[in-house]
């Protein structure tokens, strides 16, 4: 296993308010780490720190020299007055070509969408296109912000199956930010529950049994998660 990014005791303050306190984590090859927490917990700020978009007030960030990041945003804001095809959108990435674009679209099973208008894609189709675009630079770190938002259940299962295939093929680290606790607990290796600080972390089972996690999400919700995880502890074939 290889650490692509490591945070040590990272703190962020904005307008004299503590946003993140004493955050330490590692993003490791071939492992999926999922970040959960209530609104205002600092998840977006932590992602921006990891992406290098903002600097912390204190703490240490160590990135591997060969770090290459692929980012799938939570939502793509499109100007409906400026129609754009999937192919043209993919070409907005630097250092790409038609062969690479076709390869990535095929990899995410979206080659049939190449000449479609982005504005006409379903939620699941759009996520596949964003995923394909993120793969163009052969990332060793994939950051996925709410990847299942606006995607139906079958699409979510297929998307997580794809994520699992990609991480094994590329041996990349994957960070997922998600509110969908059901799929988080069934499809991730490690979980960090954030509420301006790290409330708890570890395997999904460990986090589900943590009192601070239960306090944030409620006992009933945690019990539902336990039932869901039990009923889905097997492999779906699509």
UniProtKB/Swiss-Prot annotation:
What's a Pfam family this protein contains? Answer: ABC_tran
Residue limits of the ABC transporter domain?
A: 5-220
Q: Localized where? A: Cell inner membrane
Q: Primary place of residence?
A: membrane
**Which GO MF terms are attached to this record?**
ABC-type zinc transporter activity; ATP binding; ATP hydrolysis activity
Identify one Gene Ontology CC term for this UniProt entry: plasma membrane
The signal peptide stretch is none
**The protein's enzyme class:** translocase
Which residues make up the binding site for ATP? 37-44
Keywords on this record?
Answer: ATP-binding, Cell inner membrane, Cell membrane, Ion transport, Membrane, Nucleotide-binding, Translocase, Transport, Zinc, Zinc transport
Q: What family classification does the UniProt entry report for this protein? A: Belongs to the ABC transporter superfamily. Zinc importer (TC 3.A.1.15.5) family.
Function comment = Part of the ABC transporter complex ZnuABC involved in zinc import. Responsible for energy coupling to the transport system.
Tell me which NCBIfam families the record gives. PRK09544.1
User: PANTHER family from the entry?
Assistant: METAL TRANSPORT SYSTEM ATP-BINDING PROTEIN TM_0124-RELATED (PTHR42734), ZINC IMPORT ATP-BINDING PROTEIN ZNUC (PTHR42734:SF9)
Protein name from the UniProt record? Zinc import ATP-binding protein ZnuC
This protein's species is: Buchnera aphidicola subsp. Acyrthosiphon pisum (strain APS) (Acyrthosiphon pisum symbiotic bacterium)
């Amino acid at each position: 296993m290889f650490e692509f990014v490591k945070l040590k005791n990272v703190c962020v303050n904005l307008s004299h308010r503590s946003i993140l306190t004493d955050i330490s984590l590692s993003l490791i090859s071939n492992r999926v780490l999922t970040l959960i927490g209530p609104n205002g917990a600092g998840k977006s700020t932590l992602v921006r720190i990891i992406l290098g978009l903002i600097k912390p007030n204190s703490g240490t960030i160590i990135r591997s020299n060969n770090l290459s990041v692929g980012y799938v945003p939570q939502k793509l804001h499109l100007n409906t007055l400026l129609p754009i095809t999937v192919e043209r959108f993919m070409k907005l990435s630097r250092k790409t070509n038609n062969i690479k674009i076709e390869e990535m679209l095929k990899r995410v099973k979206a080659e049939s969408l190449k000449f479609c208008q982005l504005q006409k894609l379903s939620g699941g189709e759009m996520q596949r296109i964003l995923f394909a675009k993120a793969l163009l630079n052969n990332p060793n770190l994939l950051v996925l912000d709410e990847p299942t938002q606006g995607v139906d259940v079958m699409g979510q299962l297929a998307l997580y199956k794809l994520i699992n295939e990609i991480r094994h093929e590329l041996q990349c680290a994957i960070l997922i930010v998600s509110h969908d606790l059901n799929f988080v607990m069934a499809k991730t290796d490690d979980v960090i529950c954030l509420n301006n600080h790290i409330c708890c972390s570890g395997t999904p089972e460990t986090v589900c049994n943590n009192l601070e996690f239960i306090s944030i999400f409620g006992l009933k919700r945690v019990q539902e998660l336990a039932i869901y995880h039990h009923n889905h502890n097997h492999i779906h074939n699509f």
